[in-house]
């Protein structure tokens, strides 16, 4: 493959991601408007309904855009998959256990703690120069536990779709360039799609953990880890302030 072909391949990938992000926002706005007209009583939850509706066609758009143009491999002497039984970046049948999941979950929590430490100085800096980060903080924390549409989207819908897109479609798009590049590029896109300053560093770092579990054990387990994290984050954000034991338990998890 020539340098020009590789450049065109990456240009196509970047344009596909940009089109996905723009299309997602446009469809979400259209659905919000339609929901507010058809169901005015659901206006407060229209954002979550709109995202549920919008992400599916956007994901299908990416799937059909890239399905016949992904590179199988750039290795000079690729291993015969029939002889080894699996590709080095497609080992979906490795033995998975609750202990393996706990191992990744603790790493995931630790990465969140580290990323929050990295984000705090930037938050302080931007607040000092007068930037209002209240919306970013609210979006990062999620909603209330009694907000059913929020729970469905954040705990179930978003993890499944995001993993299918970033550890599915883009994973396959980049895997010919090696494990590290695939982890970096898919994590970068994953962070960018959140469109939230406070979530960029955490999402980027957590993308590497999600890549690792996906690469070793399969997509279903990165989905499981993602939705478990989202569920725990919402519980801690809602109950951590009023129930000390919740915050203490989460702190022990981070220390582990």
Which residues fall in each region the model found?
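Eukaryotic intrinsically disordered, low-complexity segments enriched for acidic and Ser/Thr/Pro residues
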Residues: 137-140, 150
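N-terminal, membrane-interfacial amphipathic/helix-forming hydrophobic leader that caps
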Residues: 1-105, 109, 113, 216-217, ...
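Transmembrane helix-loop-helix hairpins at the membrane interface
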Residues: 147-256
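Alpha-helical transmembrane segments of polytopic integral membrane proteins
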Residues: 24, 59-63, 67, 115, ...
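Membrane-spanning helices that line or support transport/gating and their immediate boundary helices
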Residues: 30-34, 117-125, 164, 173, ...
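Mid-bilayer segments of alpha-helical transmembrane spans in multi-pass integral membrane proteins
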Residues: 109, 113-117, 121, 151, ...
């Amino acid at each position: 493959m020539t340098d020009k072909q590789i450049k065109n391949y990456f240009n196509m990938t970047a344009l596909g991601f940009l089109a996905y992000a723009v299309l997602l926002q446009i469809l979400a706005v259209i659905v919000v408007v339609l929901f507010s007209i058809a169901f005015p009583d659901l206006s407060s939850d229209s954002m979550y309904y709109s995202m549920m509706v919008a992400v599916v066609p956007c994901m299908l758009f990416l799937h059909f855009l890239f399905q016949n143009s992904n590179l199988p491999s750039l290795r000079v002497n690729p291993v015969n998959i029939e002889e080894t039984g699996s590709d080095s970046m497609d080992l979906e049948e490795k033995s998975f256990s609750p202990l393996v999941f706990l191992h990744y979950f603790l790493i995931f929590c630790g990465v969140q703690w580290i990323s929050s430490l990295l984000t705090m100085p930037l938050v302080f800096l931007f607040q000092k120069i007068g930037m209002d980060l209240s919306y970013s903080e609210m979006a990062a924390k999620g909603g209330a536990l009694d907000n059913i549409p929020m729970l469905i989207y954040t705990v179930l819908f978003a993890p499944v779709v995001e993993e299918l897109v970033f550890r599915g479609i883009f994973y396959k798009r980049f895997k010919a360039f090696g494990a590290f590049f695939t982890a970096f590029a898919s994590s970068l896109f994953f962070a960018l799609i959140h469109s939230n300053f406070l979530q960029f560093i955490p999402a980027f770092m957590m993308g590497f953990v999600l890549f690792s579990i996906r690469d070793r054990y399969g997509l279903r387990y990165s989905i499981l880890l993602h939705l478990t994290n989202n569920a725990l984050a919402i519980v801690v954000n809602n109950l951590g302030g009023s129930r000390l034991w919740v915050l203490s338990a989460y702190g022990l998890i981070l220390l582990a």
